[in-house]
């Protein structure tokens, strides 16, 4: 529709693939690992895919982004609550009153701060210049997150609450580092 009716040029658009890493519904680890390597840039075309795109995983589901906006120590939330899949997370967030309609400009900044904390924990270099420069080649950082989360699941029985959706906000310049201003 966008392409045909409005002449939208997807070849010059940033494309993000939001993907739940719910262990109950997305069980094909080999496919996910393959996509981590192929979908590493929102703007640069991957020859294997014939289209650009950045894979942004959420652990265990996209509602993790709500948690990162509204919860303190969001990374530990799933472990502390015994949450192991997306359905359980949705229920827990609802019970705790962490609802999407409570997201504000201030909580979006909190979600980026939670993301930076989580990426530091994983071992991703989050110095402003390094992180922002890595957004055009995010596959390596994505892989670090994936490997770390899989190890946490083996050790603790579940993933840490984490959504990479804020990466898109940083990549698009909708949220900027204070160092950039």
Model-derived segments and spans:
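Sequence-level detector for tyrosine residue identity
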Residues: 6, 16-17, 59, 77, ...
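A generic signature of intrinsically disordered, low-complexity regions enriched in glycine/proline
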Residues: 9, 24-26, 151, 175
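Activity-critical C-terminal alpha-helical subdomain
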Residues: 18-127, 169
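Short, surface-exposed loop/strand segments
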Residues: 1-10
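Compositionally biased, intrinsically disordered low-complexity regions
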Residues: 9, 55, 159-162
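Extended, basic/helix-rich recognition subdomains
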Residues: 99-181
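Phosphate/oxyanion-binding active-site loops and adjacent basic polyanion-contact surfaces
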Residues: 1, 28-31, 161
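Glycine-rich, often proline-containing surface loops adjacent to acidic residues and nearby aromatics
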Residues: 9-21
């Amino acid at each position: 529709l966008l392409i045909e009716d409005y002449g939208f040029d997807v070849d010059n658009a940033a494309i993000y693939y939001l993907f739940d890493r719910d262990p109950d519904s997305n069980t094909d680890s080999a496919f996910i690992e393959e996509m981590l390597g192929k979908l590493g840039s929102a703007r640069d075309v991957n020859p294997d895919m014939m289209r650009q795109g950045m894979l942004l995983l959420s652990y265990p589901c996209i509602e993790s982004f709500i948690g990162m906006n509204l919860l303190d120590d969001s990374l530990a939330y799933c472990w502390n609550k015994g949450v192991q899949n997306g359905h359980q997370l949705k229920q827990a967030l609802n019970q705790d009153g962490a609802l999407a309609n409570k997201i504000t400009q201030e909580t979006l900044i909190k979600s980026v701060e939670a993301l930076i904390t989580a990426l530091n924990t994983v071992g991703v270099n989050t110095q402003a210049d390094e992180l922002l420069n890595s957004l055009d080649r995010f596959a390596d950082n994505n892989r670090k997150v994936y490997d770390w989360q899989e190890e946490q699941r083996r050790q603790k029985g579940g993933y840490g609450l984490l959504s990479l959706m804020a990466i898109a906000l940083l990549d698009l310049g909708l949220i900027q580092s204070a160092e950039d201003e």
